[in-house]
Amino acid sequence: MSFYVPGISVVIPSFVSGAVGTDGANLVDMKLYSALASLAKQSIRKDLVEVLVVLNGDGVSSTQTNISREFDQGLTSQFPELNIRLLRSLTPGAGRARNLGIASARRRFITFLDDDDALQPRYLESGLKEADDGVVTLLPIVDTIDGHSFRDNSLNARITTLRGTTAPIASAPWVLGFNASKIIPTEIAQKYRYDELLRSGEDVAYFAHLLEISGLLLRTPKVGESSAYVRTIRSDSVSRQRESFDFNVTQRLECIAQLRTINEVAPKHRALHTLEESQFGFVKSYLKSHPDDTQRAIDTAVAIGVPGLDWEGLRREKANRLVFSYCFPPYADTSANVTAKVIRNDAELVDVYYADMERVRGRDESTRLIVDPFLVHAEEIDAVPSFAHWGAICSYARQAARKAAKRAKGQDGYDSMYSRALWSGSHVAAALFKSKHPGTRWEAEFSDPLSVGVDGTPRSGELTRGVTTYQMKKLVECSDWREISYSTHFELTELVTLLYADEVIFTNENQQRVMLERYPEDLQSFVRSKSTIRHHAVPTEEMYHLVEADYELDPKRINIGYFGNFYANRGIGDVLTALEHHPHADEFLLHIFTSKPEQLSRELWNHPAFSRLRINGYMPYLTFLNVATHFDALVVNDTDTSGSTFTVNPFLPSKYADYVGSGVGVWGITVDESPLSKLPLTFSSAAGDIEQACSVLDELLRQARYNAR
């Protein structure tokens, strides 16, 4: 059952300047009267029309007097045939005014009219005749410039091509880029609001919400004469503002940020992408005329929170550094995030080649905010992603190395190159490039041992024949250690990297020892001489605030955070057991962020400490960084290698680096002589030692009570 009265509501926002005459004559610009006069001339029955005039601006306060009543009476008496409702908003802005008008609309359909525009006499009759539920009706538009009308404008030409058609709204996204010429069901209009913070482009952001409605149609009827919207073109209109960084860049990026909050129901049409590209077109045009503002524009996009825009071709600088990163933002992966942190810490312009990881990894678009300021060229390689399949790895490596070589040729090469594994394809691509460009300095980082797995046994990886295999083997044969044997592609990749990288980066000394001890002493010495021990990259300070999270903590309790997979018999299980037995356990709250929160909740449902837990799913990386800054303590646990073949524990959790930059106390649950146990920790307990874990809770409680004094 519809609660709307038959007919159409016409919403007219009208700005009222603070500079008004005492007689009220200048309260509203005279152009409003022209708009109302065009409504008075409509051929439709007037009882089917309600006119909502929304006065807004500083001058509205002056109308809350006798003058206001006189003005209202004067307006309605001048247009007695119109059902005019006058609404007022002290806050200026067409978006706010339209929101007030939309919320107040009572008729079944709604349309918008700017106060300096007009409607031809048959506009409402023609539009209402074709209007229907689930349909947006599009009508012609003519331009008026200095009193002269022009039907042959670019927008009307596009509307003309649709005459007589009914199609999905997403098939013509350009229709959503303006307020005029549309009649929509009021029920749909009232589902959404104009963004009142946008200084321009609020019409695009508002109408783009229609892409969220399944099955919504666009109807463009064949209408007769005198059925067009009459748009007044002025040099000072919002859409025709003088070119400036604020309007052409900042405001367009703000609009794009709003567009990205919309969930498109038919993404195959790429309608949202089209609207975004239209907005970004303003940015590109401006930067082509003002190339020195390019870095400022990119930094503005990052500050606003708009990642992944196509800045390539707008920079004048070239990158002197090449990066091969098999997994890279926007793909959600620890390796991708660490490489992004390295790039941001280095603060050097780079070209990056990475693999299409769509089949095996989700996307975290926000992580591009980390690297966007430093990307000159970022190219995704079309290859089947695989951790261990040699053919798939080689496909990426060959393509990436070839494309990088072509780009290097066009810009006098690269000074340096960085690759990181795990995801061994990064090192394979770098090795192929290095073989053809020996003058490029290669920095190769190992996050973990490559040739062996977490238990210390060799990783299985069949080394099949092929061009890449031949090239990699040839590199070994041309070295001073051609006699070293290898049986898997992981072993071959590790060996070639150790031989040819100009700098080999290990995350800790144990890892360096474990990786090198399988090789001859002279090779070990050779690699050590060019090695660097560098812990996982710590996020820069601003990275913790690139995204603001709204996760709530309990201000009356001590909040402990744990991000990672949960194993009751390892590490974090110690905290759970300590909470079970601590005499003041109710003063603590353990927040767990894990990959399978529902499963973990079921497993721990009957645990005595369950009431002290908050179990959540994983967060996007930058959201996690921001949330991490609000805890009282963050828990990181060691990898237990007691049942492995390792002589020492080679694993340093990358999470430690993320925690240590947060400014929050880090609680390490460690095993003897591990890399983590040798790093600065605010709190520490040995894995499996519940008494020590309880002591950490005691210390947290003492700190909380001291700070509360």
Which residues does each predicted region cover?
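Glycine-rich, basic loop-to-helix element that forms the pyrophosphate-binding segment
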Residues: 86-105, 541, 546
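Catalytic core of nucleotide-sugar-dependent glycosyltransferases
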Residues: 227-234, 240-270, 293-304
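N-terminal subdomain of nucleotide-sugar transferases
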Residues: 2-5, 48, 301-373, 503, ...
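Short, acidic, metal-binding catalytic loop of nucleotide-sugar glycosyltransferases
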Residues: 29-48
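Conserved donor NDP-sugar-binding/catalytic core segment of glycosyltransferases
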Residues: 122-153
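Nucleotide-activated donor-binding/catalytic signature segment of Leloir-type glycosyltransferases, i.e.
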Residues: 73-85, 478-479, 594, 600-630
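Acidic donor-binding loop at a coil-to-helix junction in glycosyltransferase catalytic cores
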Residues: 199-206, 651
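Conserved catalytic-core segment of nucleotide-activated headgroup transferases in glycan assembly
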Residues: 19-31, 266-270, 534-606, 615-622
